[in-house]
């Protein structure tokens, strides 16, 4: 008898359960084969970002199987076998590891096959209400559905989700199939034909669970032919109280995402460019916050320049400090000064035993020979205290000259500011007379000092800006106003945004009276893509799917290539191509659309003019082709 450990443990059963990744893979293959390859005019959104379409699945083969096996014979099991016998589907089925996963895939594929049965009350279509330029899948009713009736074949498969999977789907913006179970209080992911049902604040259907992994849509009110089947995603799914909802109910009520955005005067003033007034804006406001703080904390009366200057980089110039210290070490006691200097400018001079007279312009000892250094500084007069402390520390280790007697050195170091605005000049004159009092260094130190001063004159370096004193720019309002995407009810129909080519135009469908964009409309199509696809698959005009009783003598068209899909020349001549069907101003919604202009009595007085125009266009097209 096998032990309990040898039996199937819950971990093994959990490992074999249906997961989100497996179900997403099944759904991508099923929608690619049975929706996108069934004469569909666009591609549905896939769950995997890098999905590659299955090779070996051809559109004509899929349509033939659906027509003969599903629509006419009503044998979905035989259609399933023929579909799985195709080379692309056979390869995918062979890659599945075990029989259990193969059964899961067949079960999920069967849901998409059954929605093509003639008794199915819905079909997949598209809408551009939400994004204007891109068509999203939707569910449209082609039969009348009573209130409380379970919508046949509009079902899906549920699979529980983990927190990591939910966050990943949120980042990929593929979270439109997440539902919250009211019984389990956990999020689940559902896929299948029901995933194409969009949200509406006044939905005509609701999602109900069937078993542990099934989900069905039940009609909450009567649904008429041509009406979109919708469900409710939640009260706060599109923001708080669905404030960003773009459903049809909100469009008719002009609320939430369709509400007009009225900009206040404050908002418009913030969006506009501020007017710079020299009297209203002080110079301190043009400086960085660190510099402004330094001015407020210091006791000096130094005012910044009247014109704002660009702040250059600050670099440590050790040679300047070394020369200043070496000249100040042998200076005797000097006379007092009437104007005490600011602390920010005298911090570069080390303390001496004597009381030297220090001013903002000159430093004058008592008597003797003079050393004058006149320098026009291009740097800011308010240097950072932390940098000054660093430089003071380095200057304490520098050597002093041994003997300097009756030496007069005059070096003028003028640094021309390369910036757009001139900098204020600060003159520092050092007049030093002293006697040789220390013989610790050789007399060649004078030449070293001169060479260092010449290096300062010849190679002026831009001050290097430290990381701490980085210029922090304030937030400057933009010159252009922010372009808020304001939606207007009906702005997704008869708009010029979808007319990319010269011969693209809006055309009115002769079957369902819905406006659609026809690309390269050299000849006008009679039906919209939905009605034309329905006719190609079922052989009848939309929404008819089968004969309506024994008295119906209309024959099904088994070969769609025998049907003429364009207007006849006499019908083409009555169509107005003015403005390519674009309506300016507020475009009405499809339900409240204006009457068709492509009728027999429209522009009857201009038949001859339209006929000539059509002949001219035809002749020019023939010449270009």
Curated annotation (Swiss-Prot):
Q: Which InterPro entries match?
A: Hist-Lys_N-MTase_N (IPR041938), Set9_fungi (IPR025783), SET_dom (IPR001214), SET_dom_sf (IPR046341), Suv4-20/Set9 (IPR039977)
Q: Where is this region: Disordered?
A: 260-348, 368-405, 432-451, 457-476, 582-625
On whether Zinc-finger is a keyword of this UniProt record, the answer is: no
Q: Which GO terms describe its molecular function?
A: histone H4K20 trimethyltransferase activity
* Enzyme Commission numbers on file: 2.1.1.372
User: Where are stretches of biased composition, namely Basic residues?
Assistant: 462-473, 611-625
Swiss-Prot/TrEMBL catalytic activity: L-lysyl(20)-[histone H4] + 3 S-adenosyl-L-methionine = N(6),N(6),N(6)-trimethyl-L-lysyl(20)-[histone H4] + 3 S-adenosyl-L-homocysteine + 3 H(+)
Tell me which family the UniProt entry assigns to this protein. Answer: Belongs to the class V-like SAM-binding methyltransferase superfamily. Histone-lysine methyltransferase family. Suvar4-20 subfamily.
The name this protein goes by in its record: Histone-lysine N-methyltransferase set9
């Amino acid at each position: 008898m096998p032990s309990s450990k040898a039996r199937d443990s819950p971990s093994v059963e959990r490992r074999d359960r249906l997961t989100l990744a497996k179900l997403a893979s099944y759904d991508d293959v099923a929608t690619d084969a049975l929706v996108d390859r069934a004469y569909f005019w666009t591609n549905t959104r896939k769950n995997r970002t890098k999905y590659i379409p299955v090779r070996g699945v051809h559109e004509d083969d899929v349509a033939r199987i659906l027509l003969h096996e599903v629509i006419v014979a009503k044998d979905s099991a035989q259609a399933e076998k023929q579909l799985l016998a195709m080379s692309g589907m056979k390869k995918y089925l062979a890659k599945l590891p075990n029989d259990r996963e193969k059964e899961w895939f067949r079960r999920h594929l069967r849901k998409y096959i059954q929605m093509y049965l003639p008794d199915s009350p819905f079909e997949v279509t598209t809408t551009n209400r939400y994004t204007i330029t891109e068509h999203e899948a939707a569910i449209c009713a082609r039969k009348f559905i009573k209130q409380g009736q379970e919508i046949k074949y509009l079902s899906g498969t549920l699979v529980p989700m983990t927190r990591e999977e939910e966050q990943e789907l949120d980042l990929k913006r593929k979270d439109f199939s997440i539902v919250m179970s009211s019984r389990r209080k956990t999020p689940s992911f559902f896929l299948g034909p029901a995933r194409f049902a969009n949200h509406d604040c006044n939905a005509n259907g609701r999602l109900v669970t069937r078993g542990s992994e099934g989900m069905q849509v039940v009609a909450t009110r009567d649904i008429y032919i041509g009406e979109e089947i919708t469900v409710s995603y939640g009260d706060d799914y599109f923001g708080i109280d669905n404030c960003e909802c773009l459903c049809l109910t909100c469009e008719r009520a002009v609320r939430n995402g369709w509400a007009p955005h009225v900009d206040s005067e404050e908002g418009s003033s913030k969006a506009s460019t501020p007017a710079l007034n020299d009297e209203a804006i002080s110079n301190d406001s043009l400086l960085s916050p660190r510099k402004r703080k330094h001015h407020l904390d210091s006791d000096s009366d130094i005012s910044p320049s009247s014109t704002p200057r660009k702040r250059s980089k600050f670099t440590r110039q050790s040679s300047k400090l070394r020369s200043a210290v070496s000249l100040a070490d042998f200076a005797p006691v000097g006379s007092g000064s009437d104007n005490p200097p600011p602390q920010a400018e005298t911090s570069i001079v080390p303390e001496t035993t004597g009381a030297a007279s220090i001013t903002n312009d000159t430093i004058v000892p008592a008597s003797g020979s003079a050393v004058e250094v006149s320098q026009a500084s291009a740097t800011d007069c308010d240097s950072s205290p932390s940098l000054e402390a660093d430089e003071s520390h380095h200057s304490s280790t520098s050597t002093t000259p041994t003997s300097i007697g009756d030496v007069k050195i005059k070096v003028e170091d003028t640094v021309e500011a390369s910036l757009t605005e001139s900098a204020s000049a600060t003159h520092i004159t050092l007049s030093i007379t002293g006697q040789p009092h220390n013989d610790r260094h050789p007399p060649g130190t004078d030449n070293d000092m001169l060479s260092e001063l010449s290096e300062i004159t010849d190679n002026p370096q831009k001050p290097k800006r430290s990381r701490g004193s980085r210029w922090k720019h304030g937030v400057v309002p933009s010159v252009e106003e922010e372009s808020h995407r304001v939606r207007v009810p009906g702005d997704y129909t008869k708009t010029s945004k979808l007319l990319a080519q010269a011969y693209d135009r809006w055309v009115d469908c002769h079957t369902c009276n819905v406006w659609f964009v026809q690309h390269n409309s050299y000849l006008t199509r009679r039906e919209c893509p939905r009605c034309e696809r329905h006719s190609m698959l079922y052989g009848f005009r939309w929404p008819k799917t089968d004969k309506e009783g024994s008295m119906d003598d209309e024959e099904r068209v088994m070969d769609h290539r025998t049907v003429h899909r364009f207007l006849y020349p006499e019908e083409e001549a009555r169509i107005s191509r003015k403005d390519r069907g674009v309506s300016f101003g507020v475009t009405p919604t499809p339900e409240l659309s204006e009457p068709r202009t492509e009728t027999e009595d429209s522009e009857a007085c201009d038949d001859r003019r339209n006929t000539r125009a059509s002949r001219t266009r035809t002749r020019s097209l023939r010449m270009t082709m």
